[in-house]
């Protein structure tokens, strides 16, 4: 790599199970094909788009650091907003990014970092769709889940 960095984006479809359950697996398959083509159309020529399984995709960005991956994420969001305008069932994507070597020195660690970032994005997107009165309870529940011992945040 020319400048010694590259980034990995982990892309997960939001609410994909609902598409399969309510519209059928054939529609789910068409949705996955649509997303794969959408991603391929909106990355640079030398970027690599892979479906890793289920409703997850990985995009490898050679010679792109954090700034480059952020630009691509913004471009994907804008293009997705435009593409969703004509869709009966809008598609949502949660995207996490990680940059080598800052976020991991091995492929496994880099993917773990991108996965954690994607999960945080997905949680923020879900929280944004909750009625306002349920958000504090949701935040508390997420805090409880992150404690290393799995116990309550206050108490005994």
Identify the meaning behind each predicted range.
Residues 13, 64, 85, 100:
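Hydrophobic pocket-lining residues within nucleotide cofactor-binding pockets
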Residues 41-46, 77-88, 120, 124:
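Short catalytic/binding micro-motifs of nucleotide second-messenger systems
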Residues 25, 46, 79, 102-103:
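Nucleotide-sugar donor-binding/catalytic module of glycosyltransferases
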Residues 1-8, 14-44, 50-54, 58-62, ...:
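Conserved long alpha-helical elements within nucleotide-processing catalytic cores of c-di-GMP signaling
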Residues 58, 96-97:
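Short aromatic/hydrophobic contact patches that present stacked aromatics
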Residues 30, 67-71, 88-89, 100-156:
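Catalytic cores and conserved motifs of cyclic dinucleotide signaling enzymes
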Residues 51, 80-94, 126-131:
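Catalytic core regions of nucleotide second-messenger enzymes
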């Amino acid at each position: 790599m020319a400048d010694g960095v590259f980034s990995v984006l982990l892309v997960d479809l939001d609410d994909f199970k609902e598409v399969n359950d309510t519209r059928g697996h054939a529609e789910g398959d068409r949705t996955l094909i649509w997303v794969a083509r959408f991603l391929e159309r909106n990355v640079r020529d030398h970027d690599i788009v892979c479906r890793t399984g289920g409703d997850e995709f990985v995009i490898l960005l050679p010679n792109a650091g954090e700034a480059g991956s952020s630009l691509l994420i913004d471009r994907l969001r804008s293009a997705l907003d435009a593409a969703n305008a004509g869709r009966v069932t809008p598609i949502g994507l949660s995207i996490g990014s990680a940059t080598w070597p800052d976020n991991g020195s091995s492929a496994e660690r880099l993917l773990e970092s991108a996965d954690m970032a994607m999960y945080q994005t997905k949680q923020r997107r879900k929280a944004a769709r909750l009625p306002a009165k349920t958000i504090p309870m949701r935040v508390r529940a997420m805090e409880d889940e992150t404690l290393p011992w799995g116990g309550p945040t206050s108490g005994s």
